[in-house]
């Protein structure tokens, strides 16, 4: 699956002001995703395993 990485409060994980390539590494390391990029202003991840939670509009509290 794919989606936005979340912080500890369930909000989208910000990529501002992170260096280029930060989100790719973050998604791979923390979400076990295949890749990721900064979809300003938040990290968006591809190839996230189905058991890993990503940000969901329906349950957004931020």
Curated annotation (Swiss-Prot):
Residues 1-62 form the LCN-type CS-alpha/beta domain. Belongs to the long (4 C-C) scorpion toxin superfamily. Sodium channel inhibitor family. Beta subfamily. SMART domains: Knot1 (SM00505). InterPro entries: LCN-type_CS_alpha_beta_dom (IPR044062), Scorpion_toxin-like (IPR003614), Scorpion_toxin-like_sf (IPR036574), Scorpion_toxinL (IPR018218), Scorpion_toxinL/defensin (IPR002061). GO terms for biological process: defense response. Keywords: Amidation, Disulfide bond, Ion channel impairing toxin, Neurotoxin, Secreted, Toxin, Voltage-gated sodium channel impairing toxin. Disulfide bonds join 11-62, 15-38, 23-43, 27-45. It holds the Pfam family Toxin_3. CDD domains: neurotoxins_LC_scorpion. The modification Cysteine amide is found at residue 62. One of its GO terms (molecular function) is sodium channel inhibitor activity. It is found in: Secreted. Has the structural arrangement of an alpha-helix connected to antiparallel beta-sheets by disulfide bonds (CS-alpha/beta). GO terms for cellular component: extracellular region. Its main location: secreted. This is Toxin Tb2. The keyword Amino-acid biosynthesis does not apply.
């Amino acid at each position: 699956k794919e989606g936005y990485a979340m912080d500890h409060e369930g909000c989208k994980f910000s990529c501002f002001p992170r260096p280029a390539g930060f989100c790719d590494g973050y998604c791979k390391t923390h979400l076990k995703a295949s890749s990721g990029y900064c979809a300003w202003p938040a990290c968006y991840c591809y190839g996230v395993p189905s058991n890993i939670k990503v940000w969901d509009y329906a349950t957004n509290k931020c």
